[in-house]
């Protein structure tokens, strides 16, 4: 079971984020599934449609995102993953002009998998801090020439 869950989570990151497939969200995220902590620490997204709305916003800002999974730990129906997202801020979907900065975001996701779908995801990342730094860079032409990591 845990190897199947591991494979599902690997497919999730590869297809949903790296290949940007909305069909994969419908396939792998349970209808009543909940995603906590994305995009903000106190956010709760319920179901594929809610997740797809945020997914589109995120890809609108970072269309070249690529996530690399690092540690993957499986136990029963839970899969924990540490990951790094590398991307360039190229769009204005976050509500401010693109800075064209290359950025990285480290995170950890703990997912609950049942019957081949993700039913819960708890995400831990510093998205708010990243957006704050990008907003500051957008407001300052000097900072906009520097790379954030």
Where are these regions (language model features)?
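C-terminal and inter-domain tail/linker signature
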Residues: 1-149
């Amino acid at each position: 079971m845990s190897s199947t869950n591991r494979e599902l989570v690997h497919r999730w990151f590869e297809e949903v984020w790296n290949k940007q497939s909305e069909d994969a969200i419908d396939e792998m995220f349970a209808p009543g599934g909940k995603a906590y902590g994305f995009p903000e620490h106190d956010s709760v997204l319920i179901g594929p449609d809610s997740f797809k709305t945020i997914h589109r916003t995120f890809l609108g800002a970072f269309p070249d995102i690529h996530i690399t999974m690092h540690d993957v730990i499986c136990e029963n129906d839970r899969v924990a993953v540490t990951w790094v997202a590398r991307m360039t801020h190229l769009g204005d979907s976050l509500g401010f002009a693109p800075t064209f900065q290359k950025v990285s975001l480290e995170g950890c996701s703990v997912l609950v998998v049942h019957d081949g779908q993700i039913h819960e995801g708890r995400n831990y990342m510093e998205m708010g801090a990243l957006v704050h730094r990008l907003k500051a860079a957008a407001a300052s032409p000097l900072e906009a020439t520097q790379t954030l990591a």
